[in-house]
Design a protein with these regions (language model features):
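Short hydrophobic alpha-helices and adjacent helix-cap/hinge residues
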Residues: 1-196
Length: 196
């Protein structure tokens, strides 16, 4: 018979990322996102989350296909944003590109969010990240789901899961510099794990 496939994504869902921004900046509503053309599915997922948020977030998106266009995209984005987000795409994976976004945010007094602990250590405000232990546990559970779903009919569509629950990391120094008093990491992590 056909074997069902389970796919575990390395990063938390965009809805979790947005929930974190919402929890840290409850009064703000404009989120600036720099994306690469390849990250369009992530942008679409974030747009859905932004529309479903209550109240909705106003997503400002600039596409930067390469390092040269990054500076131009940031210049256009910063004045229209209350916060910036680095997606787990080619920009988020590139240290130089991430630092460009962090510098632009710092220069304008905007908090920067992302999906990696490295971003927070380098001057980002907060990130919803997946930890290796939590990914391993989720992979085991996904394996059990795949095994038990083997007997049912729709075995040809893969089971795809975003990393969950996300763990929140905050840079307290950056928060103080921005005059923000976000909740504790543990409280934010619990808040993201709660059903919305």
């Amino acid at each position: 018979g056909a074997r069902r496939v389970g796919v575990l994504l390395r990063d938390p869902a965009m809805a979790d990322q947005l929930a974190l921004v919402n929890a840290v900046l409850p009064q703000k509503r404009r989120l600036g996102v720099i994306a690469t053309p390849e990250s369009e599915p992530l942008v679409r997922e974030l747009q859905r989350a932004a529309q479903n948020a209550n109240p909705a977030w106003d997503l400002q998106v600039e596409i930067a296909p390469d390092a040269r266009s990054l500076a131009t995209a940031l210049r256009a984005l910063v004045p229209r944003s209350d916060a910036l987000m680095v997606l787990p795409d080619l920009i988020g994976d590139s240290q130089a590109a991430t630092l460009s976004v962090l510098h632009a945010g710092a220069g304008a007094g905007l908090p920067v969010f992302g999906a990696s602990e490295g971003l927070v250590r380098s001057g980002g405000l907060a990130a919803a990240v997946s930890t290796p232990g939590q990914l391993a546990q989720q992979a085991r559970q996904l394996g059990q789901k795949v095994a038990s779903a083997g007997s049912t009919g729709n075995s040809n569509s893969p089971l795809v899961e975003a990393a969950t629950p996300a763990t929140v990391r905050i840079n307290a120094t950056v928060a103080r510099g921005l005059g923000l008093r976000p909740p504790e990491e543990r409280e934010l992590t619990e808040r993201l794990a709660a059903p919305r």
